[in-house]
Amino acid sequence: MDKSKIRNFSIIAHIDHGKSTLADRILEITNTVSDHDMDDQFLDQMDLERERGITIKLNAVQIKYKDYVFHLIDTPGHVDFTYEVSRSLAASEGALLLVDATQGIEAQTLANVYLALENNLTIIPIINKIDLPSADIEATKNEIEEVIGLPTDNAVCISAKTGLNCEAVLAAIEKYIPAPKDADDSKPLKALIFDSYFDEYRGVVMLIRIFEGELKVGDEFMFMSNGQRYFVSELGVRSPKETKKKRLEAGEVGYVAATIRDAREVSVGDTITLVNRPAEKALPGYKKKKPVLYTGFYPIDTRDYMELKESLEKIALSDSSITWEQETSKALGFGFRVGFLGMLHMEILQERLNREYKIGIIATSPSVEYDVHMTDGSIKKISNPALLPDRTFIDHIDEPYIKAEILVPNEYIGNVMELCQNKRGIYINMDYIDANRSRLIYEMPLGEIIFDFFDRLKSLTKGYASFEYDLIGYKTSDLVKVDILLNGDKIDAFSIITHKDSAYSKARDLTQKLKEAIPRQNFEVPVQATIGSKIIARETIKAYRKDVTSKLHAADVSRYKKLLEKQKAGKKKMKMLGTVEVPQEAFLSILKTNIDKKK
């Protein structure tokens, strides 16, 4: 294969800027997919992606254009899936920067552009949705030049929806994106694993980009991180259906199967090389993104525990950003503490476990990881509020802080600043991008933004604001643990860590929500929120009242009183012996409720 005719590229875009639609048009124009087989969001193969209209998983497809071979590596746009984007960019030489002409640059787009620049990729600006009346092409070009510092001389203006000028995108890829560097088949094999998934028949299937050397069916290869060896059983490319090949060359993107049954042996970002002629040095791979959010996952049926563990291992093949470890809850039994990149990431995984693996789970209230400084000088990392030590042994608690960059229309600046203030944000800076939009910089506790910050930001600005954040370290805060007691018993799965100033309002919201979610029992159930031994909020779930006097004559007063006294005595006994049955909906309601009430 002529290496000068290979082009490897990704598409960078914010949600709803038309990335999946542009990918569809490229597949159509190049006849990679026939009209008969074509569906909207063709590369978004998961049902969840189609339902939500977002890309969750990266995808890779080989496209023939003239005498060129293009490898399109599709990427997600949501802030929670930045890790997927970084993996796609590591396997590319260039990127299409897709910007909506009606909305301009968004914060998440900026973050992904910086990732592309760090990888030394060639970036081609593509201005989309020019068919809409509100499109402002010149303003969008100016924004790309001023905000990103990227020249727009080679910018292509298109409508991915109608297909207008989409041919020019292919010509720009051919002209501006460089061919793979140092793509020499004769060198020792160096191939980057940028994704993987589990197949029931073939075992672990890896998506790879070959930088140097070649790989053939029957070759014995090894992972450079752990030295594990396997023989290639199947090779091929996706175009977009899997097409088997005898070999993959330097510069190509394809898949490899080797009947690997143990999912833990494959690590995304690892380098594979041949056993008989190994490479001296592994490829750089990429920096693993650390989870920012932790929650407990417990199977509804305790017999599904091992099945849940195996399912998490399989999902981790294609989503190596999740972490998990075993934990035990007095209320819920055996489960796992799972780490995520955000709330959407968590919801998607929960949905995948339910749909793909048929496992029903209960998720506890999410939390961030705190540094707990003990009075003896030691530091404990706590992500499960139930494990927070007694206050008498704690010197102080540090919580993670982020630097948030918010792009907002000028008319909504006041609303956004108030929201940040309510989230304990520290104002750092503000600058004007142009006459209509500004950039706000705030430092905020990570724990304040993981629940509902993104949704509230969108609702306060009618969907026009966007934000991106980076972790900047830990700061000491006045934090307390709020415990929930049901009928006097502490339910560890409901515990939360929060700032002292908002503890009372959050406790009221929690008790109120539990009162609504837990069905009435045959006895009265107090729902209490406590800090230490102090009760700070209480609700009562009223008991059912059985009408024991319904058969009596109205005049039979003594009998009437006797039956009521008997019922009262029976209820006291039930209250003493009874345990409260908490339905799954109670956990879901706490998870989905806006715990931080709008102030």
From Swiss-Prot:
CDD domains: EF4_II (cd03699), EF4_III (cd16260), LepA (cd01890), lepA_C (cd03709). The keyword Protein biosynthesis applies. The keyword Transport does not apply. Coiled coil: none annotated. One of its GO terms (molecular function) is GTP binding. It is a peripheral membrane protein. GTP binds at residues 16-21, 128-131. This is Elongation factor 4. It comes from Mycoplasmopsis fermentans (strain ATCC 19989 / NBRC 14854 / NCTC 10117 / PG18).
